[in-house]
Amino acid sequence: MENVVSLQNVVRTYIMGDNEVRALRGVSFDIEQGEFVSIMGPSGSGKSTCMNMIGCLDRPTSGIVKINGRETALMTEKELAVLRNKTVGFVFQQYHLISAMNILENVMLPLKYQKVDRAVRIEKAKAALEAVGLGERIHHKPHELSGGQKQRVAIARAMVTEPKILLADEPTGALDTETGKQVMEMFRKINNEQNTTIIIVTHDPRIGESTERCIKILDGQIVTE
C-alpha cells in the first residue's frame, strides 16, 4: 500500500517572544492509503501541530513531511493550496457552516472554489448529503439542524471533493456521547466504502480506541503507535 502521509524526523519550533517552543521533537510516522487512524494526546502535546503538517497548513522547521508523495517544504504556497483543496478534506469541532446558506449550498462551496460547473456541484453535493443521511433536508438552514446533523453536513462538505485524506480535529468534542458514536460510525462507513484515509485528532481515549490504529503523542514526541 502507498503512504499518503509520511513524517520523517519532523521538528517544529515556534519563537514566542524571547522563548523557543518546540511543538514537535523528531516525529516520524507513515499512514497508508485507506487507513483509519487517530492521533491522540492531551492539550499541548503537539497533536494539533501534526494536524497542521498533514493538512498543509504549516511547514516543518526541519525534517520531511510528504503528503500524497509530495514534500511540502519544497512546494509554493499556491501548490500547497491546490494540494489542500484536492487531496485533504477538513472536519472541525466547530462546524463552520455559513448560516445564510442552506446545507446544499454549504456543501457545494468547496466545488465552487475548484471552478466545477454549477450543475455538477449540485449533483455531487446532493449525493454527499444523501450519503450522510441528510438527502431529505437539503434546503434546511444550519440553525434548523441538531449538532449531530450539522457535523454530518460538515463531513459531507469535506467529502464532496472526493479527497484522499479526511482530517478531523476533535470532531465529536461538541457532541453528546451517543451522537459522537454516530459520527464515528459515519467515518467508519466512509472509510470502508470509499477507502478514504481517515485521520482523527483527539484527546479522548474512547475515540482513540475506536480507530484501527492510534498514534499517541506527548510533549511533541510519539510515545506509541
What are these regions (language model features)?
Residues 2-217:
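ABC family nucleotide-binding domain
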Residues 219-225:
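Conserved switch/coupling elements of ABC/ABC-like ATPase nucleotide-binding domains
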